[in-house]
Amino acid sequence: MASTFVSISNRALTLLGAQPITSLSDDTKEARSCNRMHEQSRDQVLRGHPWNFATKRVALAANTIAPVWYYTNAFDWPSDCLRILQVDTVEEWVVEGRSIVSDAAAPLNIVYTSQVTDITLFDTLFVEAYALRLAADIAYDITASQPVMANMEELYTRKLAEARM
């Protein structure tokens, strides 16, 4: 069965021993918690590992407004960029806000993690990590238990380590 935001939420709720939901808009504590946190949890998992399905390459044009001092060029991140993974330049570069500043000439080639919202692109390991991250993020709201929350954090950390293997 294909994953949905509801099925991922229900996996997180099951880990917490809570009742499943039928929709993120259900008028229940569980649905409200999942609805409030699922996008933040998803983006945190995306940032936590260079997932193949979320990795993109792009050549950035220099911004028309140069940095005030030190560096000669600024390059704005793509709008769907969550994390810069690689910048293809021998020049020094730094991230400032949502820009890369450097003396590198345009175009600046980068590899980055994109914000993927199409759930059909998620791989199974990502779905498991996402459910664990969501469980950790909603654990205290659902269970009022610090130990349960800490356990979900630990399980999430282990799942992310598994992804790195």
Predicted regions located by residue number:
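Internal mixed-charge
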Residues: A2-S3, S7-R11, D88-M165
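Short secondary-structure subsegments characteristic of cysteine-rich extracellular domains
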Residues: D26-V45, V148-R164
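Short, extreme N-terminal leader segments that mark the start of a protein/domain
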Residues: M1-R36
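An acidic- and aromatic-residue-enriched active-site/binding cleft used to recognize and process polar
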Residues: A18, D26, K56-L60, Q115
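Divalent metal-cofactor coordination and adjacent catalytic microenvironments
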Residues: R32-R98, F122-I138, I142
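Generic macromolecular interface patches on structured domains
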Residues: Q19-T22, W51, A144
